[in-house]
Amino acid sequence: MDVVVGMEARGFMFAGPVALSLGAGFVPVRKPGKLPGEVYSQSFVLEYGSETLTVHQDAVPPGSKVLIVDDVLATAGTVRATASLVEQLGAELVGVSVLLELSALGGREKLDRAGIGPVDVVLTV
């Protein structure tokens, strides 16, 4: 694992310590306007509206192995958008790790259909 990517804001709380324990770098994925310089952007739809995430264009060297870490997997919009950003960076997504999965919302199935995974979950409700 070269890099752990965490999404704003609660994902930062988990992704940073995971990166530290793996001896990997940490890359924040943020909402628009919060990162200076050139960024890649990816919009996605939530159950209550839409959102956009951004990452520095030079955040990850091409070919790096990337783990996405977030707090909750619900509809999978945030993870799918982040996976798209990882792809735009030219990196290899090797997995997704989340603390809590809300299984009734079907996020894991959406990730499976999109070919995103493997997905590791600490607790499913």
Positions of predicted regions on the chain:
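Short glycine-rich phosphate-binding loop at a beta-alpha junction
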Residues: 1-8
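Conserved acidic residues
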Residues: 2, 64, 94
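Residue-level signature of catalytic and energy-coupling elements of molecular machines
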Residues: 4, 26, 96
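Generic enzyme active-site microenvironment
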Residues: 6, 68-69
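Short, glycine/charge-rich flexible loops or terminal/linker lids adjacent to PRPP-binding catalytic cores
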Residues: 23-67
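Conserved G/P- and acidic residue-centered "switch" motifs that form tight phosphate/ATP-binding loops
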Residues: 71, 76
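PRPP-dependent phosphoribosyltransferase catalytic core
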Residues: 81-125
